[in-house]
Amino acid sequence: MSWINFAWLTLCGVALIWSASARAIVDVHEQYFAAPESSKLSSWSFDVSGATGNDDRQAVSIETHNLLRGDKSTWLFVADYSRAESNNLETEDNQFAHLRYVHKMGGGQGLEVFAQVQRNRFQKLATRQLLGAGYRWDRSEATGPRRLFGVGVFREREELVTLADKENVWRGNFYATFNVPLDLARGSSLNFSAYVQPDIENFADLRSIAVAKFVVQLTDRLSIDFTLAYDHDSKPAFGIDAQNFRYSSGPTYTFKD
């Protein structure tokens, strides 16, 4: 491994430790399959908004995903940060980072290990850390639809703002993700992912998410996406809704070789 690759992975590791979005589940597979022809990729998305007068508010968000591909392995690093204020009061403060290593075994099969940290002060999540591993089965076609299925397990450590105790549990990890190229516009595609993560010792404690994303490629490096997401937590913290619906849209610029 060259010193450039080593530096890239070191930077990802440092950011992972430092970053510590209370989305209990975060879909990263759309980023994993981005730009399949590239061995290295770094994509950044920035969003700044604000208003003054009757409505005084400011918001900023930064997202990045990075890939390092080899013949038998792939590294993925994804992170985001968002903060918002309204009338001089903080209304959002999220941080998230995910690092994943995939070893390919042939026939579309592979093994993966991953680590993740996240926080969201306004959804009472002081910190959530997890470390896990699993098996994946990739049924993607070179120029057609993509299908990926995975099963695994991870250890989760969660600390809520409202509780002194830290919760440590083992969770199962089951997911499926699909990508379908569309002819509606140049380079457009529709992505869908679904995850289910039950507590192994108490299946009544269940987390799940479904994400749909429509992507239009404006140039080789610039794209715009529209995302809808629904997540469910059977045992949310006190004062937090069990169900949550999110939507977002914005441009993304990609550096690749």
Predicted regions span which residues?
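Transmembrane beta-barrel strands of outer-membrane/channel proteins
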Residues: 46-50, 77-83, 113-117, 133, ...
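Repeated loop/turn-to-beta-strand initiation elements of outer-membrane beta-barrel proteins
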Residues: 72-77, 108-111, 143-147, 182-190, ...
